[in-house]
Amino acid sequence: MAPRILLARHGQTEWSLSGKHTGRTDVPLLEEGRVGAKLLGERLHRAPFDGLPDAEVRTSPLARARETCEIAGFGDRATTWDTLMEWDYGSYEGMTPADIQGVRPGWFIWRDGVPRGETLEQITARADEVVAWARSADRDVLVFAHGHILRSIGARWLGLGVDFAARVRLNPTSISTLGWAYGEPAIESWNDTGHLA
């Protein structure tokens, strides 16, 4: 069977709750985020996942992703990987979309990018690196990371431009599975938060 990639978004933080662009700022999880990470871990240790005993696990080195990985019960198996870090928002770090549009009307990150941060081409290259790694694996892979990079990985898995990521939501402590259908890359599940209900 061809390998799949499971995408786990980190738990809720103060900045994600308020809508601030949180790239490289190392903010911790809120208590709500820790609870969500625990529930995510319980979900991943039940059928059909059963703890993913054969999966390779990687996590962003940023605290919110690492802590989610650890609380979910995968910390001892995880390798940190800088490629999974969130988009470097440059001058827009810590700002909400409304703040940015106040000074740059019509701004849209997936079209316009960010000043003094990563370009769309750079985020695409990082997403492509993750996709290539996952497809070359001899087993399923599980990654703990961030909203924009995970959405970009989803788009690139399907062979689409990263701007497609603007059309999909990805909630904190959600799990998504990218796999195959009829021999082609497919989304098996997306933004699944059933464990939080």
Model segments located where?
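Phosphate-handling substructures
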Residues: 71-128, 179, 186-189
